[in-house]
Amino acid sequence: RAEDAGGTGGVLPLTRAASAVSARMFALAGRLRGGRPLHPRGLVFDATLHLHGASRPWGVPFLDDTAELRGMARLSRAAGLPPPLPDVLGLALRWEQPADEAGVAELLLASTGQGLLGRHLLRPRMRWVPAFYGSLLPYAVDGRRLFLGAVARPTRTVPADDAALARAADERPI
């Protein structure tokens, strides 16, 4: 899902300052934790990305075209809190680009809200599915900004713990 954020896509001084503070905090957390500061554990699955195309052209095949891409998905809990405590959930996607765009692409998403304000806020959840996973910050595309997201369709409920996720994936695609 792509959503226009408006604006020119320029980097604001506040954004640069927030990025610098975040980088220092994550480096410190990683040293204190002795490993990854966020998403320390997760499960990796084969994945199929179903791209539906945007409602208006962006000039980028990934956004404009209807396609089915094969790749990998990693689902993880951000803080690594034990279930059943809610945690911010992460969805990391990796896929091979089509032949004319050689290389590997990655998209990192987290459980967020969907509204005008909510898309900027992390949302701790207790279930992998149903859920919305979005980009916290917009991507710059041809002078415009947009938010990307993925919807875990509500065909069933899957609690946010690794064992339940593994069982659900063994039964059928998530």
Model-assigned labels for residue ranges:
Residues R1-I174:
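Active-site-adjacent core segments of small-molecule enzymes
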